[in-house]
């Protein structure tokens, strides 16, 4: 089973393997998805820069991919990782650190 990239980018929810905590949300195109499969490290597509980026390439806070899941419509991806260091560029463990309710 493969993701359906016919409509473009797919959301990729990244979660920590042990805790299942949501670390971040990013987007993948088909090339980022294939590079993620090949390298077992996360690759995403930057909508603002319009280019691929490898999580942790600059910071060293890499994500080692343990498994990938597709939703029932094959248009969203869950990436289960072992995170090295914080996931958020702000230095927080997760990008979802602002509690609303």
Curated annotation (Swiss-Prot):
Cofactor binding, per record: Binds 1 Mg(2+) ion per subunit. Binds 1 zinc ion per subunit.
Binding residues for Mg(2+): 71, 73, 75
Enzyme class (EC, first level): hydrolase
Location(s), subcellular: Cytoplasm
Gene3D superfamilies: Phosphoribosyl-AMP cyclohydrolase
Binding site for Zn(2+): 72, 88, 95
Pathway noted in the entry: Amino-acid biosynthesis; L-histidine biosynthesis; L-histidine from 5-phospho-alpha-D-ribose 1-diphosphate: step 3/9
Keywords per UniProt: Amino-acid biosynthesis, Cytoplasm, Histidine biosynthesis, Hydrolase, Magnesium, Metal-binding, Zinc
One GO biological process term: L-histidine biosynthetic process
MF-aspect GO terms: magnesium ion binding; phosphoribosyl-AMP cyclohydrolase activity; zinc ion binding
Summary of subunit composition and partner proteins: Homodimer.
Stored HAMAP family: HisI (MF_01021)
Main function: Catalyzes the hydrolysis of the adenine ring of phosphoribosyl-AMP.
Protein's UniProt name: Phosphoribosyl-AMP cyclohydrolase
Gene: hisI
């Amino acid at each position: 089973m493969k993701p359906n990239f016919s409509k473009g980018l797919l959301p990729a929810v990244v979660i920590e393997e042990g805790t299942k905590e949501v670390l971040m949300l990013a987007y993948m195109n088909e090339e980022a998805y294939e590079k993620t499969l090949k390298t077992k490290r996360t690759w995403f597509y930057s909508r603002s820069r319009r280019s691929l980026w490898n999580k942790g390439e600059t910071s060293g806070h890499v994500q080692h991919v343990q498994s990938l899941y597709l939703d029932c419509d094959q248009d969203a991806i869950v990436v289960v990782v072992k995170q090295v260091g914080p996931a958020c560029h702000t230095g927080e463990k997760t990008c979802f650190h602002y509690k609303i309710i």
